[in-house]
């Protein structure tokens, strides 16, 4: 409807770790691009964009592929409805302002909604990792209202990691006091919880556990 009518729409897709948010986002980009819609995939973090650009280049020119993947700070000068669809992965990690010194634009969430006829935000508010992470469902709804956009929301529940064990993740949420899930049954085992500052240390710890269990 947004594509045909220019009516601005926003979709919020909420999902926890391993629910397929990034896979769905990339597949949407491929599908929309194949239908000749002007679409881009957005993340704050450059690492996934670099990987996708490398994997998807194929016979396409590098400039063509690079133009499909953008950072979240690219839209503060965009015109209204300049894009058909903007797909935001890890929307919880959006900043408020853009630029190296965080002094450009007004708000990344608002600027993305303004720039697209249809904007899709994949989000998990429990995965914010820095104090500058400002993306939230509340902010998306607020700026969508300012820009007269209709908001739709959906939730991804199926688990594609941990052998599809939704109960295990619910148990983790309860143990880590992320939320009370009342999921106590079936996980009566000893466990260690450690906080490490170096991902290499975490890898080594996991490998040692794998040796014990495998």
Task: Please state what every model-predicted region is.
Residues 2-10:
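Phosphate-binding P-loop
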Residues 13:
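Hydrophobic anchor at the beta1->P-loop junction of P-loop NTPases
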Residues 17:
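The conserved Walker
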Residues 25, 152-167, 177-214:
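Conserved helicase/translocase motor-coupling segment
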Residues 38-86:
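Inter-Walker segment of RecA-like/P-loop motor cores
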Residues 87-155:
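Signature of the SF2 helicase/ATPase Hel1-core->accessory helical subdomain module
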């Amino acid at each position: 409807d947004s594509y045909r009518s220019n009516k601005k729409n926003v979709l919020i897709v909420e999902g926890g770790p391993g629910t397929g948010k990034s896979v769905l986002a990339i597949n949407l980009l491929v599908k929309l691009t194949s239908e000749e819609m002007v679409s881009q995939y957005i993340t704050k973090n450059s690492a996934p964009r670099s990987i996708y650009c490398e994997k998807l280049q194929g016979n396409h020119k590098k400039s063509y592929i690079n133009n499909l993947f953008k950072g979240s700070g690219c839209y503060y000068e965009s015109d209204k409805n300049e894009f058909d669809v903007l797909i935001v992965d890890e929307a919880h990690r959006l900043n408020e302002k853009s630029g190296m010194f965080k002094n450009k634009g007004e708000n990344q969430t608002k600027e993305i909604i303004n720039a697209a006829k249809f904007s899709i935000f994949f989000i998990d508010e429990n995965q914010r990792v820095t104090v500058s992470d400002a993306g939230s469902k509340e902010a998306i709804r607020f700026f969508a209202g300012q820009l007269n956009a209709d908001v739709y929301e959906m939730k991804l529940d199926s688990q594609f990691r941990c052998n599809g064990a939704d109960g295990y993740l619910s148990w983790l949420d309860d143990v880590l006091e992320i939320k009370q899930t009342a999921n106590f049954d079936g996980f009566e085992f000893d466990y260690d919880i450690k906080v490490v500052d170096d991902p290499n240390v975490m890898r080594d710890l996991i490998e040692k556990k794998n040796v014990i269990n495998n």
